[in-house]
Curated annotation (Swiss-Prot):
Disruption phenotype: Impaired central domain protoderm patterning defects, and defective cotyledon primordia cell types. Enhanced shoot growth, and male sterility due to defects in anther dehiscence and pollen maturation. Residues 36-811 are extracellular. This is LRR receptor-like serine/threonine-protein kinase RPK2. It comes from the Eukaryota. The gene is RPK2.
């Protein structure tokens, strides 16, 4: 056989038929070999990308210490996760945001400052250390297999690299809490698989782009805490979770926001500048679980359509400008557990520390952003109180009225109810006593009557507050009626992570903390730990006090306890049994002031309650000596035993062990002897009030070592010797009406002469004027609001020639008179040019905008033209008043329709825009004893307010003419004004300080009903709430002494002014009556009242005929009340709520 060529043999071999499985295996092997090679190359590339990333960023905390070239297993590096092919699929590096080089103002720990932020996206901050910084490296885009990019709470800055928007496989983009700037792109080239985008708390600006709706798989979007502006787009309802809080979003919400919201579960639009109505279409979002719209300026009513939200668990619409009745349909939200319709606590109170004023949009006002409030009509439908899953019902200070809800269903889940500071009437229903899981019940400052139910689980409640009502009967012995087990005391730890799958737990802890530290007695924040607060104050409770209503489970060294029952009619012996179990608590605060308690302070109080921090038993009838054992209460911070009948000497033990004592007042008692030298050891003391006793001896020289002392009141005693020199500057200082001698030392040149008057042996008080009178420091009558101060005998002594004496009294008087005339002339010249420069011309300029904004309908239209016409172009013939803010004119708009027009002095105001913002708040205020603000006009050349017209004139005229001596009429006037001020102070958000309470600002109708006018106008002048930056801060004679010393005003300054008005109403004297001249310089009606009371001559104070006609005891009680309102110590002055309560207790019977 002939052999074949070798080449042919080879071909034939390869041409032989091979089995198909062998062919497939060979092909697969070849493909795998090629793929493995490629994967190896890609994996090596991922490692190099990570190393380049590390090289690019700043890492002062060595977070990336494990990322080293020598390590082959880069998939085990910190923050790196890989798939089965060793491709990097996740980069998850959470920083603390608190490294030393970090410029980031929002750290992971700062989440605790915004407890309601981030449902569905909240994270645990524990275990995070350090922070990466620098620009976000664009090399990260080379990780083409990356599905999760999570770098929250670092300090990355600059714009987000453009390439990130094109990463096709990325599912999670989390850059929360960095410093990223720039805006979101108009178009996204990738991100088709993105499910989560979290850019919260960066500095991203611009508008929300429509291109976001192209990311069809996006479910969770968090853009909160940025600088996004523009409006909320309609497509945002397509996401499952949407967070846009704390941005610059403005305008109305789109009406169609709920048209495509089938997946929406969480929607947070809080802390923006949204206006207009809440869209009804949100009622179509059937899967919605939480809806947070708080802290905007949304208007009108809550949509009825919300009743369709069967899965809704949390609804918070607080701090808006909503109105109207609460919809009954909310009772259909069967899953609702948290309902917040108003809220006095600012959830974003720490916004300044994170964002600052500079981060607000142009023209925005942070104050107005946090001061809006809702004012509803009617009451709470019982369909809401019967909701089966309701845990929190929070509607304080929302102008709700009517009968208190009686049907609370089974209330098995109910834990918090806050309906305080409304206008509910009636009794506390039996149904509430069945709510055994209640841990907070606040019904304070309503108009509730009847007796307290002993079945209410008060001993188990962390907060129980019924203060400021008209409840009567005894305070029950709740302990004998508590059978159920108490839930644990909740304390909010702002740095811990809560279960954010249950938003109600966040609200529970947040409100618990706020309610505890927001008590009127003390801020417990410095002590920390849980607290229990039980408030029965300012009611009509009688009887004796039992043991503190605190369950056994509540006792423990971690718990602080506050008990307040002041302002009632409690009687009996000093309640020593109240301090049982006191030593089983961390700290105890007790207020039983303004009652009728008698007897002695128990000698063993120090052994009963070593944890006592505050004891206020002022304004009672306690007698006997002060126990020496009180000095052993080393934890005591404040002790107030003023206005009692204590006798004997002040024990020296009070100053030896009480190192923590900051406040001590034992004024207005019958104490004798000397001031203990041991008081010089009270180095923490801030306030010392020993006034109006019978103390003798000298002022201890060691007082000059009390560097923290700001208030020293020793007036109205029998002290002798010199006034020690070397005192620190006092906010309040008074040693008048003693027997002191020697020179008057200057306390940094600011000792008022009136504070040392009534000491016949003191050298004459040399006077200088603290301020030069100007147009801004004059009241409506032209009285200059200046004060006389003692000058230093050295610094202010006139130069004397050798051998010559000083100026004689006649020369001094002549110089003083000449100086006064010159000052007045200068003031008149300044006033002339000021008015020439700023005040509008008498005729209305043609360019004035003619819009009049109305807050209510009075049946006839009020226009700019008919106001000008009705006032005769503001003619003097229609002038009915002239004050510091402008002139007031009577205007008959049409037949039987008369209004009062207050034409404002434009030169005083900061601008029309601010005026519009401020007047909006005043226009909402409604109270039976406030002059009603009907409308206003404001332009660059003209401003006026429209008020209801009151034909009875003002109280100043009433007192001068002494129109009546009927005690019932006088009492009603006093009560009317007290109610108006209490409303401004305690039921307005923000609270309104009047700053100029005086008879001419109190108007009367024909039936002698009283109305307070000019409220809120001081704020319109552009002054802050606590600092008076212009002269409009009161009228001389009515100004509180602390304002003269510190230029600070508060609600207690209004209380002082009210007390002066009340004294005028009771007497026939003015605040600075000419008849007081004989008593010396600076003597006023307050000092006159104190003098007569101290001398037992109260009868002489009252106007002729009033004493004979009125009940003597009640008249003296009201006189005492007026004097307490005018004491120098702010903490001793009552609140206006307490004044109202006391006047109601002294109300004379009607005919």
């Amino acid at each position: 056989m002939t052999s074949l060529p070798s080449s042919v043999i080879k071909w034939r071999f390869f041409r032989r038929q091979m089995p198909s499985d062998v062919v497939f295996s060979l092909c697969l092997l070849c493909f795998a070999s090629c793929l493995a090679g490629k994967i190896t190359v890609l994996a090596d590339s991922d490692k190099s990308v990570l190393l380049r990333f590390k090289k690019t960023v700043s890492d002062p905390g060595s977070i990336l210490a494990s990322w080293v070239e020598e390590s082959e297993d880069y998939c085990s590096w910190f923050g790196v996760s890989c798939d089965s092919s060793s491709r990097v699929m996740a980069l998850n590096i959470s920083g603390s945001g608190s490294s030393e080089i970090s410029r980031n103002r929002f750290t992971c720990g700062d989440i605790g400052k915004f407890p309601l932020y981030g449902f569905g996206v909240r994270r645990d901050c524990t275990g995070n250390h350090g922070a990466l910084a620098g620009n976000l490296p664009s090399v990260i885009m080379s990780l083409t297999g990356l599905r999760v990019l999570s770098l929250p709470f670092n300090s990355f800055s600059g714009e987000i690299p453009v390439g990130i928007w094109g990463m096709e496989k990325l599912e999670v983009l989390d850059l929360e809490g960095n410093l990223m700037t720039g805006s979101l792109p108009d178009q996204f080239t990738g991100l088709r698989n993105l499910r989560v985008m979290n850019l919260g708390f960066n500095r991203v600006s611009g508008e929300i782009p429509n291109s976001l709706q192209n990311l069809t798989k996006l479910e969770i979007l968090n853009l909160g805490g940025n600088k996004l502006n523009g409006t909320v787009p309609g497509f945002v309802g397509r996401f499952r979770v949407l967070h846009l809080p704390l941005n610059w979003l403005q305008g109305s919400l789109p009406k169609d926001i709920g048209d495509s919201c089938g997946k929406l579960e969480h929607l947070d639009l809080s802390g923006n500048f949204l206006t207009g109505r809440i869209p009804e279409s949100l009622g179509k979002c059937a899967g919605l679980r939480s809806l947070l719209l708080y802290m905007n300026t949304l208007e009108e009513t809550i949509p009825l359509e919300f009743g369709s939200l069967q899965k809704l668990e949390v609804l918070d619409v607080s701090r808006n400008t909503l109105s109207g009745p609460l919809p009954v349909e909310l009772g259909n939200c069967s899953s609702l557990s948290v309902l917040v319709l108003s809220n006095l606590y600012n959830v974003y109170e720490d916004i300044n520390s994170v964002r600052g004023e500079a981060d607000l949009p142009p023209g925005a006002d942070l104050t107005s952003m946090t001061e809006d409030f809702n004012f509803y009509q009617g009451g709470i439908p019982e369909e809401i109180t019967r909701l089966p899953k309701l845990k929190i019902l929070w509607v304080p200070r929302a102008t709700l009225e009517g009968r208190f809800p009686g049907d609370w269903g089974s209330c098995q889940n109910l834990e918090m109810v806050n309906l305080g500071q409304n206008f509910f009437k009636g009794e506390i229903p039996v149904g509430l006593s069945k709510c055994k899981n209640l841990r907070l019940l606040d019904l304070s400052s309503n108009r509730l009557t009847g007796e307290l139910l002993k079945e209410i689980s008060v001993p188990c409640m962390s907060v129980f507050d019924v203060g400021g009502n008209s409840l009567s009967g005894v305070i029950p012995d709740f302990l004998n009626n508590t059978t159920s087990h108490c839930p644990p005391v909740v304390y909010f730890d702002r740095f811990s992570i809560e279960s954010y799958s249950d938003p109600s737990s966040v609200y529970l802890s947040f409100f618990t903390e706020k309610a505890q530290v927001g008590t009127s007695l003390i801020d417990l924040g410095s002590d920390g730990g849980p607290a229990v607060f039980h408030n029965f104050a300012d009611n009509n409770f009688t009887g004796t006090l039992k043991s503190i209503p605190l369950a056994q489970e509540r006792l423990g060294k971690r718990v602080s306890y506050i008990f307040s029952a002041g302002g009632n009619r409690l009687y009996g012996q000093f309640p020593g049994n109240l301090f049982d179990n006191c030593d089983e608590l961390k700290a105890v605060y007790v207020n039983v002031s303004f009652n009728k308690l008698s007897g002695r302070i128990p000698q063993g109080l120090n052994n009963m309650c070593t944890s006592l921090k505050i004891l206020d038993a002022s304004v009672n009838q306690i007698f006997g000596p002060i126990p020496t054992s009180l000095g052993d209460l080393a934890s005591l911070v404040a002790l107030n035993l003023s206005w009692n009948q204590l006798q004997g000497q002040i024990p020296g033990s009070l100053g030896k062990k009480m190192a923590a004592l900051t406040y001590l007042s034992i004024a207005n008692n019958n104490l004798t002897g000397q001031i203990p030298q041991s008081f010089g050891q009270l180095h923490s003391l801030d306030v010392l009030d020993l006034s109006s006793n019978h103390l003798s001896g000298g002022i201890p020289h060691d007082f000059v070592n009390l560097k923290n002392l700001t208030v020293l009141l020793l007036n109205n005693n029998n002290l002798s010797g010199p006034i020690p020199s070397g005192f620190a500057t006092f906010a309040v200082f008074n040693v008048s009406s003693n027997n002191l001698s020697g020179p008057v030392p200057s306390t940094n040149g600011l000792t008022k002469c009136s504070t040392v008057s009534g000491n016949p042996y003191l050298r004459p008080c040399h006077v200088f004027s603290l301020t030069t009178p100007s147009s801004d420091s004059r009241d409506s009558t032209g009285d200059s609001i200046t004060q006389d101060y003692a000058s230093s005998p050295v610094e202010n002594a006139p130069s004397q020639s050798p051998g010559k004496g000083g100026f004689n009294s006649l020369e001094i008087a002549s110089i003083a008179s000449a100086s006064a005339i010159v000052s007045v002339l200068i003031a008149l010249v300044i006033l002339f040019f000021y008015t020439r420069k700023w005040h509008p011309k008498s005729k209305i300029m043609a360019t004035t905008k003619r819009e009049v904004t109305m807050f209510m309908d009075i049946g006839v239209p009020i226009t700019f033209d008919n106001v000008v016409r009705a006032t005769g172009n503001f003619n003097a013939s229609n002038l009915i008043g002239n004050g510091g803010f402008g002139a007031t004119y009577k205007a008959e708009i049409s037949q039987d329709v008369v209004v009062a027009i207050k034409r404002l002095s434009i030169g005083r105001f900061q601008g029309v825009q601010q005026f519009h913002a401020e007047i909006k708040t005043l226009g909402r205020l409604r109270h039976p004893n406030l002059v009603t603000l009907i409308g206003y006009h404001a332009s660059e050349t003209e401003m006026f307010l429209v008020y209801n017209y009151l034909p009875g004139g003002n109280l100043e005229k009433f007192i001068q003419e002494r129109s009546t001596r009927d005690w019932r009429v006088l009492h009603k006037i006093a009560l009317d004004i007290a109610r108006a001020l209490a409303y401004l102070h305690d039921q307005c958000v923000p609270r309104v300080l009047h700053r100029d309470v005086k008879p001419s600002n109190i108007l009367l109708d024909d039936d002698c009903n009283a109305y307070l006018s000019d409220f809120g106008l001081a704020r319109l002048l552009g002054t802050s709430e606590t600092h008076a930056t212009t002269g409009v801060a009161g009228t001389f004679g009515y100004v509180a002494p602390e304002y003269a010393m510190t230029c600070r005003v508060s609600d207690k300054a209004d209380v002082y002014s009210y007390g002066v008005v009340l004294l005028e109403l009771l007497s026939d004297k003015k605040a600075l009556d000419p008849s007081f001249v004989s008593y010396g310089n600076g003597f006023n009606i307050v000092q006159w009242a104190c003098m007569l009371l101290r001398q037992g001559r109260a009868k002489e104070f009252f106007t002729a005929g009033l004493w004979d006609a009125g009940p003597h005891d009640d008249l003296v009680e009201v006189l005492h009340l007026a004097v307490v309102c005018t004491v120098d110590s702010l903490s001793t002055r009552p609140t206006m709520k307490q004044v109202v309560r006391r006047l109601k207790q002294l109300q004379p019977p009607s005919c």
